[in-house]
Structure formats: structure tokens, C-alpha cells
A protein has these predicted regions:
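Alpha/beta-hydrolase fold active-site loops
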Residues: 50, 76-77, 133, 158-159
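A domain-start/cap signature at the N-terminus of enzymes
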Residues: 1-50, 180-185, 193, 209-220, ...
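Primarily recognizes the serine-hydrolase "nucleophile elbow" in alpha/beta-hydrolase
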Residues: 107-155
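Extracellular/periplasmic catalytic domains that process cell-envelope and extracellular macromolecules
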Residues: 44-47, 71-74, 104, 153-156, ...
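Cell-envelope and extracellular/periplasmic
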Residues: 56-57, 99-102, 114, 125-126, ...
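The feature captures the conserved acid-bearing segment of alpha/beta-hydrolase catalytic domains
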Residues: 139-223
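Active-site machinery of serine-nucleophile hydrolases
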Residues: 51, 55-97
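Gly/Ser-rich "nucleophile elbow"/oxyanion-hole loop immediately N-terminal to the catalytic nucleophile
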Residues: 42-47, 87-115, 129
């Protein structure tokens, strides 16, 4: 194993980003609107912020963007969860809408996927490498059999990060074979892949490492890229 080293729910009549709280009330959203949007504390319209596009797994109705960003950074990023994280068009709609309303650096857009969403993040980024500055997968498999690194000249310079818990289960999550195959693929293709492997510190060793324990490393990796 290799070791390398408050949100608001969107509404059409949205709150002013100059509001100190950066919070709006939770509402029922039109399908074209992002599911959740996070503005950094002290948002300044004259500064172009990196945009983080979060892709939680499709059955995770409890993903809390605000809590996640509080653990990651309150000031560095704008962040959004698309209305349908499993749909590429929905992802780009969320990006376009956020860029039309807030100050986003068009060359600093990062995909961050969790488990199943991590595979989608790899997929979307490799299919559209010019649209993203980097991609992070948390316990999500790289789609090994889709030829995503076939567009070698376009994809090999795209920074990618894989965060994995050594205790993840097989199935939709990573296992040792997935990790080894992914490392061999990137080595052969000359792709840019940074990996973090997290050791479980629980007493019985069965509980997975939480996303909150990983976001600090993701923040540092992105800021190094910026």
C-alpha cells in the first residue's frame, strides 16, 4: 500500500452574498437549481474564488455541505452540490449558474466526489479535462475499463487526488486490488495522481475514517495547486 504524502439551500430569490451569515433558509428547489451552495465567510465580489463541485454518493440524503466546508475552510472557496450529482449535465448547470451569480475563477474549478461520486468525478474530469483544474475522489473507484486516459495529451496534466480508507469494504468502494490497478494505470500513462491512505484508529478497527478527517488534506492539496 502506498502512502503519499454554513451553507444555504439555493432559491431563485437568493440571499445577498454580502450577508455576514452566508445562510439562507432551506427551501424546495427547482430541478435546475443546485441542491446546496456554500459562500465563504467575508465573501468579496471582486475576488475570483476557486469553486468546489461536490458529488456525494447518490443515496446519501444526509450530505451536509455546510458542515463539510466548516471542517475544510470557511474562507477559501465557493462550493456547490448539483441537483443531480450523478448527471454530467446537472453538474455543468450548477457550475454555470454559480459562475453567473458569484465571483468564480474559471480556471480553478475542482470536482470532489465521495464513494460512488468519486468515480463520477474521475469520469467527468477525464471526459472534460479542459473544464476542471483538478479532481478528488474519496473512496471512489477510478473507472478502469472506460479508457478514460486514452486522451493522453489532454488528461495527463490534470491533477488528481485519491483519498482512501484502508478499511473500506469491497463493492462500490475501493479495495486493495482497485488501488493497485489504479496506481499501475497512472504510472504507465504518466498521469498525475496523488494518494492519501488513512489508517483507522478506532478500537475495533471496523469504523470507516470520516470525510471530516480527510478534508484538511484535500484543502492543502488544492491550495498547493492554486
Amino acid at each position: 500500500m502506498v502512502h503519499q504524502s454554513t451553507v444555504f439551500h439555493y432559491e431563485s430569490n437568493h440571499c445577498s452574498p454580502s450577508s455576514r451569515g452566508s445562510l439562507c433558509n432551506e427551501v424546495n428547489l427547482p430541478s435546475s437549481e443546485p441542491e446546496q451552495l456554500f459562500l465563504p465567510r467575508g465573501y468579496e465580489s471582486g475576488y475570483d474564488y476557486p469553486l468546489l463541485v461536490w458529488l456525494p454518493q447518490s443515496d446519501d440524503a444526509h450530505f451536509d455541505l455546510g458542515r463539510t466546508m466548516m471542517r475544510m475552510s470557511l474562507r477559501n472557496y465557493i462550493a456547490v452540490v448539483p441537483a443531480d450529482p450523478s448527471d454530467l449535465e446537472s453538474c455543468f448547470e450548477a457550475i454555470d449558474l454559480t459562475m453567473s451569480r458569484y465571483s468564480v475563477h474559471s480556471r480553478r474549478i475542482y470536482l470532489i466526489g465521495v464513494e460512488e461520486g468519486g468515480g463520477n468525478a474521475f469520469r467527468y474530469a477525464c471526459q472534460n479535462p479542459e473544464s476542471f483544474a483538478g479532481v478528488v475522489s474519496v473512496n471512489g473507484q477510478f473507472p478502469l475499463r472506460e479508457g478514460l486516459l486514452g486522451q493522453f495529451d489532454r488528461v495527463r496534466s490534470l491533477p488528481m487526488m485519491l483519498c482512501c480508507d484502508e478499511k473500506t469494504k469491497t463493492g462500490e468502494l475501493l479495495n486493495d486490488r482497485d488501488v493497485n490497478q489504479t496506481l499501475r494505470l497512472f504510472h504507465a500513462a504518466g498521469g498525475l495522481l496523488s494518494m492519501r491512505v488513512y489508517r483507522n484508529k478506532s478500537t475495533d478497527g471496523t469504523q470507516q475514517v470520516s470525510l471530516g478527517d480527510m478534508v484538511g488534506d484535500i484543502d492543502r492539496w488544492i491550495m498547493d495547486e492554486v
